[in-house]
């Protein structure tokens, strides 16, 4: 598997570790052909993820069926392995547009700066900072709080707070990899390099703790993250559902 491929699978694994199969907002489906299991689909709230099992591939017939499954279920976003980007984007283009993103891996210098970082912040304090930055979070406080606290309690996620103005959340911690998710700074403190400092601190701290630290960002942010100490290691595509006006 490529790193992007393993990221999709790891996130599916973290969903399963957090919730299992007993909740109606998380579903798993097997991808099969001629009785052989090729991969797995997960649907968590409105997000779908598709991954292959090790040494398995999707042929054009299976990709056509996956496209039909996507169009039938109409998730808000679909993530999958980069090698299938062009084909699935073409097959679903009537209702989805492809959004490229770059995957980064942190390259540590083994030098943790002396920042006063709260590693166990109150999640309400984290939400207060993220809400102005991410409308989807702002509009779903209870859902965000329930999911984040559930994962934190199980050691699958962690939030960090720098002062009372910048935060970052680890979206998952599984199989020795920590994926950095939402990073935000309150509007009046932006432009002061707080997020940059916090991300560097997190990268060094988690590397020291034995984790690989990764994150995803839009391609135009490559230079920003490289300056912090992240190195681009892949590009993939996320399908975003086209909102009909």
What residue ranges belong to the model's regions?
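Conserved GNAT acetyl-CoA-binding A-motif
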Residues: 73-82, 206-218
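Short glycine/proline-centered loop/turn elements that form peptide/ligand docking sites
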Residues: 199, 219-224
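Flexible, substrate/cofactor-facing loop regions flanked by secondary structure
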Residues: 112-177
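Conserved acetyl-CoA-binding loop-helix of GNAT-fold acetyltransferases
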Residues: 58-68, 185, 191-205, 227
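Conserved donor-binding loop and adjoining core beta-sheet/short helix segment
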Residues: 13-74, 164-181, 186-187
């Amino acid at each position: 598997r490529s790193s992007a491929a393993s990221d999709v699978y790891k996130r599916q694994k973290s969903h399963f570790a957090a919730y299992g199969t007993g909740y109606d907002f998380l579903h798993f489906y097997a991808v099969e052909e001629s009785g052989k299991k090729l991969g797995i689909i997960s649907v968590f709230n409105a997000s779908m993820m598709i991954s292959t099992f090790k040494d398995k591939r999707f042929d054009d017939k299976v990709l056509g069926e996956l496209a039909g499954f996507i169009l039938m279920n109409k998730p808000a976003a679909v993530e999958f392995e980069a090698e299938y980007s062009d084909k699935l984007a073409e097959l679903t283009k009537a209702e989805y547009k492809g959004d490229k993103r770059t995957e980064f891996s942190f390259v540590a210098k083994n030098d943790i700066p002396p920042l006063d970082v709260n590693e166990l912040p109150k999640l309400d304090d984290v939400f207060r900072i993220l809400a102005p930055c991410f409308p989807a979070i702002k509009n779903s406080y209870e859902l965000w709080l329930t999911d984040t606290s559930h994962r934190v309690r199980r050691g699958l996620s962690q939030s960090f707070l720098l002062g009372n103005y910048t935060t970052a959340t680890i979206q998952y911690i599984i199989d020795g990899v920590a994926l950095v998710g939402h990073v935000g700074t309150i509007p009046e403190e932006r432009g002061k390099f707080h997020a940059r400092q916090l991300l560097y601190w997190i990268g060094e701290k988690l590397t020291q703790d034995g984790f690989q630290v990764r994150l995803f960002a839009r391609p135009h942010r490559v230079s920003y993250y490289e300056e912090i100490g992240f190195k681009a290691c892949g590009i993939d595509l996320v399908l975003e559902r086209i909102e009909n006006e």
